[in-house]
Every structure is written in C-alpha cells, then in structure tokens.
Amino acid sequence: MLKKNKKANSNNSNATAYSPLAYLKRPYFKRSKACPLEQCPNEDIDYKNKTLLSKFTSEYGRILPSRITSVSSRKQRLLSTAVKRARYLALLPYC
C-alpha cells in the first residue's frame, strides 16, 4: 500500500505566489475611455471610406474589438456593418 504524503497539507513555498498581495503588484495601464470617432465629427462611417475602416481592422482583415479600439458600442456596430459592406464590394479584403 502507498502511504500518503503528510507534508502535502503543510504550508508550501508556492502558497505565497497566490496571495492577494501578488495580484496588486501586477503592472497594468488604463486605456482612454473616450471614443476616437467622437473626437472627429467630420469623419463619416461609410463603406467607401477605406482609410478609416482600415484603422479598425487587423492586418489579417479582421474587425478589431471595441475593448482594443475603445470605440463606443453604437459606433462599433456601424463600423462592423460598414466593413462587411466594403468586403462584399471588394473594397476591403476578407483575409
């Protein structure tokens, strides 16, 4: 029969890595909450505006999420429909 290790229940040196203080020391940065499209009211979200749409797509042609671009949810919906229309008309690549 195998004997169970009695030291498994004792305090381990790895237990300090999961302490709440370890999470406080993690570096992070805050993104600006302002929508970049609200700052320029002259910019229209249109499927023909390739330069604007390419700013919000990745290098592989995927639409970037709003948590990365900090675009408001309403503008994100308008961007996604404009990108999809531009893809359909072959103004933007699918991939």
Swiss-Prot record:
What organism does the UniProt record list as the source? Ehrlichia canis (strain Jake)
One matching Pfam family, short form?
Ribosomal_S18
This protein's name = Small ribosomal subunit protein bS18
Q: Name one GO cellular component term.
A: cytosolic small ribosomal subunit
Looking up SUPFAM superfamilies in the UniProt record yields: Ribosomal protein S18 (SSF46911)
Complex formation:
Part of the 30S ribosomal subunit. Forms a tight heterodimer with protein bS6.
Protein family according to the UniProt entry: Belongs to the bacterial ribosomal protein bS18 family.
Gene giving rise to this polypeptide: rpsR
What PANTHER family has UniProt attached to this entry? 30S RIBOSOMAL PROTEIN S18 (PTHR13479), SMALL RIBOSOMAL SUBUNIT PROTEIN BS18M (PTHR13479:SF40)
**Which keywords belong to this entry?**
Ribonucleoprotein, Ribosomal protein, RNA-binding, rRNA-binding
In terms of Gene3D superfamilies, this protein maps to: Ribosomal protein S18 (4.10.640.10)
Q: Where is the signal peptide?
A: none
Question: Can you cite a GO biological process for this protein?
Answer: translation
Its annotated function is as follows: Binds as a heterodimer with protein bS6 to the central domain of the 16S rRNA, where it helps stabilize the platform of the 30S subunit.
| Gene Ontology terms for molecular function | small ribosomal subunit rRNA binding; structural constituent of ribosome
Q: Superkingdom, according to UniProt?
A: Bacteria
Taxonomy of the source species: Bacteria, Pseudomonadati, Pseudomonadota, Alphaproteobacteria, Rickettsiales
